[in-house]
UniProtKB/Swiss-Prot annotation:
Disulfide linkage: none
Highest taxon, organism lineage: Bacteria
Identification of the protein by name: Transcription elongation factor GreA
HAMAP family assigned to the protein according to its UniProt record, in alphabetical order: GreA_GreB (MF_00105)
InterPro entries cross-referenced by the UniProt entry: GreA/GreB_C_sf (IPR036953), TF_GreA/GreB_CS (IPR018151), Tscrpt_elong_fac_GreA (IPR006359), Tscrpt_elong_fac_GreA/B (IPR028624), Tscrpt_elong_fac_GreA/B_C (IPR001437), Tscrpt_elong_fac_GreA/B_fam (IPR023459), Tscrpt_elong_fac_GreA/B_N (IPR022691), Tscrpt_elong_fac_GreA/B_N_sf (IPR036805)
Keywords: Coiled coil, DNA-binding, Transcription, Transcription regulation
Example of a GO MF term: DNA binding
Function: Necessary for efficient RNA polymerase transcription elongation past template-encoded arresting sites. The arresting sites in DNA have the property of trapping a certain fraction of elongating RNA polymerases that pass through, resulting in locked ternary complexes. Cleavage of the nascent transcript by cleavage factors such as GreA or GreB allows the resumption of elongation from the new 3'terminus. GreA releases sequences of 2 to 3 nucleotides.
GO biological process: DNA-templated transcription elongation; regulation of DNA-templated transcription elongation
Keyword Membrane: no
Coiled-coil region(s): 10-37
Statement: the UniProt record of this protein carries the keyword Secreted: no
Similarity-based family: Belongs to the GreA/GreB family.
Gene: greA
Length: 160
């Protein structure tokens, strides 16, 4: 039997997934069923684009529900405050300066299930996070990214 993939995440990340799951099950599912019902009333389903679109959306919603249920079932909750031992760990917020230009960037390292670069949350599987994990404040680190090597100095690590 294959082992299930573990999804490391913060309590906040798990709560967001639970909220999304609740929304999908109680609101989106009903909306899609209603769209299918309306589209069926148009008659011939063989050339009914509204029906096809609603069925596609239903498949997406059901797939997302299954994915989220799996993530929640296999969640490994990370307590950043507990794990923070002076080293960059999952759940930490890290501020670093790109060398040599001095551009400052701040990211929170989270599990892939809750990553959102637009909110400054990067996956622990991303090249930047992989390069920062296990290092401490004041360290200069070379991070290998698809665009090439990037040198940074870790300025601050905080538990999120």
């Amino acid at each position: 039997m294959a082992t299930e993939k573990v999804f490391p995440m913060t309590l906040d990340g798990k709560a967001k997934l639970e909220n999304e799951l609740q929304e999908l099950k109680t609101v989106k599912r009903k909306e899609v069923v209603e769209r299918i019902k309306i589209a069926r009333s148009f008659g011939d389903l063989s050339e009914n684009s509204e029906y096809d679109s609603a069925k596609d959306e239903q498949a997406f919603v059901e797939g997302r529900i299954t994915t989220i249920e799996n993530m929640i079932r296999n969640a490994q909750i990370i307590d950043a405050a507990e794990a923070h031992n002076g080293l960059v760990t999952l759940g930490n917020t890290v501020t670093f300066i790109e060398l040599p230009d001095g551009e400052e960037e701040t990211y929170t390292i989270v599990g892939s299930a809750e990553a959102d670069p637009f909110e400054g949350k990067i996956s622990n599987d991303s090249p930047i996070a992989k390069g920062l994990l296990g290092h401490k404040e004041g360290e200069e680190v070379t991070i290998q990214t698809p665009a090439g090597d990037m040198s940074v100095k870790i300025e601050k690590i905080t538990a999120s």
